[in-house]
Amino acid sequence: MTLDSYNIFNDEYLFNMPLSPLPKVLGNFETGQSVLTLTTPTLTPTTTRNIEDTLGHLLSDTQTDRVAGCAGFAVPKVLPNAMGAIDALGMGIPTCVSSLPLQQTYDASLGQGSESEDSNASYNDTQMNEEQDTTDTSSAHTDSTSYQAGHIMAGSVNGGGVNNFTNVLAAVSSSRGSASVGSSNANTSNTPARRGGGRRPNRSTNMTPEEEQKRAVRRERNKQAAARCRKRRVDQTNELTEEVEQLEKRRDSMRKEFEALTNSKKQLEYLLATHRSTCQKIRSDMLSVATCNGLIAPAGLLSAGSSGSGASSHHNHNSNDSSNGTITGMDATLNSTGRSNSPLDLKPAANIDSLLLHIKDEPLDGAIDSGSSLDRFPVTSNGSSINNINSIGNNMNSPTLNALNKVPKERPNTLAFQRPLGQMHLSMANNKAGGPTQIQGVPIQTPSTGTFNLVSLMDGGTGLTPVSGPLVPNSSSTNKHPLELPTPTAEPSKLVSL
């Protein structure tokens, strides 16, 4: 049941009681409805259907006359079973109702609605409340109290604080009656101010023709500037695209060139590797050395030496060595083809005899004693000193000749030394079964060759310190050369073997 049906019902039965002979009908309806509201305080679908059926039965005679004022509401047909249900509830309504009082009642309700017209604000509030109520389906909004936009119905004549259906219909009819008549005036009122953004209207009412012309010129100028900006962006994009394509083509060409060079390099390396195994020239160059007088010389000296003497026999007549004069082999880096032909800084090779001739003869130092070992070998010219050294090389006892002796000596097993006083007695000196007891006149002092006692140890020493006497300078030692002064290692060792 819509709000229009409520409006019609209230206009017919609530506000026009003196004009309609239905006071008893309303009394019976309120009595039956009061009992229903106690058990069902809300407006249920069953109650709504019963009200629609009752209104359809009452308005069947005047349906054609009031279709234009019902906002497109079509009253459904009356069903017999619905009427029976209403009679069973004690809500029977007599059907002998004349059409004339109803028509007068409808006209009177319209007149009252027009006199009690409200402002546009009340109409907007009512519309907002109705939309909120119809969209919300919660139990709080289906109640009759919340249905009236928060207005609580308190202290009615029949209900007394209870949610009375009659009071609900009266409140709704008051708002709807004023809204139905004032809808035409609401359409003709001024439009409210815009609350949000959005595009400006095409034409303002208070704009002069000059301002309109300026606006048109400004819009045209903005359009042209936007078109130029778009064209500039398109041109720049096209230029960048062309540049990228050119760079990609260049990259492809360079990649192909690199691949071609790599392939040629591999082919050359393969040919070189296969040629080295069968090349005869490399084998001959590995053994050829270009020399000049026993030294590696540049090409200039080689050519001069080969033209003047028989040095050409040492010169290899091939392309590598004849021009460079270098050692050739497997490594090509030794070949100095790209080097300059400037002569090397080499000293000329001279004979040893010519070098000995330039040695200056110096007199011997008078301070050297005649008994010195250096006095035995005077230096003579023309290499005679070498012959003297070789002739005297048989003497192995002289410490000065040991340095000149080139014959390898056998390494001794013990350290040779001499006893100072000869008081050490060997118990096995005459034992011929043992090994040799002397090496070059030096007795071998080992545990296997002699027996030591306390007397011999105290007489000869403990063997931990040198047993030679103190070094007393004499006239001969003072006059000797500094190289001939007695040192612990200048003569055969005087240390006891450990």
Swiss-Prot record:
Predominant place of localization: nucleus
Biased composition (Low complexity): 135-144, 177-191, 304-325
Keyword Nucleus: yes
Residue positions, PTM Phosphoserine: 342
Region of interest called Leucine-zipper, as start-end residue ranges on this chain: 240-247
Entry keywords, A to Z: Activator, DNA-binding, Nucleus, Phosphoprotein, Transcription, Transcription regulation
GO BP: any one term: embryo development ending in birth or egg hatching
Pfam annotation, one family: bZIP_1
Biased composition (Polar residues): 108-127, 333-343
Name of the coding gene: kay
Protein name, UniProt field: Transcription factor kayak
Recorded superkingdom: Eukaryota
Protein location: Nucleus
Function: Developmentally regulated transcription factor AP-1 binds and recognizes the enhancer DNA sequence: 5'-TGA[CG]TCA-3'. May play a role in the function or determination of a particular subset of cells in the developing embryo. It is able to carry out its function either independently of or in conjunction with Jra.
Subunit record text: Homodimer. Heterodimer with Jra. The kay-Jra heterodimer binds more stably to the AP-1 site than either of the two proteins alone.
GO molecular function annotation: DNA binding; DNA-binding transcription factor activity, RNA polymerase II-specific; RNA polymerase II cis-regulatory region sequence-specific DNA binding
CDD domains reported for this sequence: bZIP_Fos
Region (Basic motif): 214-233
Entry-linked Gene3D superfamilies: 1.20.5.170
Domain bZIP: 212-275
Family, as annotated: Belongs to the bZIP family. Fos subfamily.
GO cellular component, as recorded: nucleus
